[in-house]
Design a protein with these regions (language model features):
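Catalytic metal-binding/acid-base residues of hydrolase active sites
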Residues: 225
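Secreted/periplasmic carbohydrate-active enzymes, especially glycoside hydrolases
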Residues: 1-201, 210-212, 216-217, 249-251
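Generic structural signal for helix capping and beta-alpha/helix-loop junctions
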Residues: 207, 228-230
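Active-site neighborhood of glycoside hydrolase catalytic domains
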Residues: 215, 236-252
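Short acidic, glycine/proline-rich loop/turn micro-motifs
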Residues: 54, 232-236
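Hydrophobic residues in well-ordered beta-strands that form the structural core
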Residues: 220-222
């Protein structure tokens, strides 16, 4: 029995103060018998080196202030052999977390621990999350700092001016065989040049590129490599039929 997938979706409340983290894990059973009594325990930590003094961000306490648990538990329904079952969806509430933005790319570490019916740890995985709310809103002139009405990009309730570049995953010296060191150098050049936005030109990139943009604070515009060029090809383009929407989105 193993964790097949882990999806964590962060959000902020309407005041952009407190955070929530919606978590969904898929559990797969490769055994010969139905797996019963499994659960997933989630803990959220500040993104720093672990030590004995490092407490989870989410920590339930009793009326006297003593810690009673440091994780949220999601139950898993019985999984027949060869199949996958979604664990119970849970939402972690975090009081006034540090927010993620290009200027302050603060991140947290989510730990997911799969346990069996005897409470034995079977597998542990982790992922990085940042609390932020991204919105595109019609803004009247009296609410804009420059007195200009328009459709603006907001991060955590504040308008953001995107200063971006297109990026192809290629290098004149090594072609498409870009190293991680080269990627990190690119991000450093962007930050030094006050660039806060990058568009992956036409296709998804190496997962490490997404990791770096998340780590250093770059607003990343991802694309599905469909090459339909919006409405360039006219009515015959697959950009038009809504039936193809899910297929397009799945490519991102």
């Amino acid at each position: 029995v193993q964790i097949r997938d882990l999806v964590a979706t962060p959000d902020l409340d309407n005041n952009y103060t407190d955070g929530s983290l919606t978590i969904q894990a898929d559990i797969r059973n490769f055994g010969k018998k139905t797996a019963k009594g499994y659960k997933v325990c989630y803990s959220l930590y500040a993104n720093k080196l672990y030590s004995d003094e490092n407490e989870p961000v989410i920590l339930a306490r009793d009326t006297k202030g003593a810690a009673i648990r440091n994780s949220v538990v999601a139950q898993v329904e019985p999984i027949t052999t060869g199949n996958t079952q979604e664990a119970e969806k849970v939402v972690l509430k975090v009081k006034n977390p540090n927010k993620w933005s290009a200027e302050t790319p603060y991140r947290y570490t989510l730990i997911a621990e799969l346990k069996d019916h005897k409470n034995r740890s079977i597998e542990t995985v982790s992922t990085i999350v940042g609390f932020r709310k991204v919105e595109i809103k019609d803004t009247p002139a009296d609410q804009d700092e420059f007195g200009l009405a328009g459709r603006y990009y907001y991060v955590n309730g504040k308008t953001i001016k995107l200063k971006g570049v297109n990026r192809h995953e290629t290098n004149p010296a090594v072609g498409h065989a870009i190293t991680r060191e080269m990627m990190e150098k690119e991000v450093m050049l962007m930050k030094q040049g006050n660039i806060n936005h990058v568009r992956n030109s036409h296709y998804t990139d190496d997962p490490y590129w997404y990791y770096l943009c998340n780590k250093y604070g770059i607003y990343l515009e991802d694309e599905a490599n469909i090459e339909s060029h919006e409405y360039y090809y006219g009515a015959a383009s697959l950009s038009h039929p809504v039936e193809w929407k899910n297929a397009h989105v799945a490519r991102v």
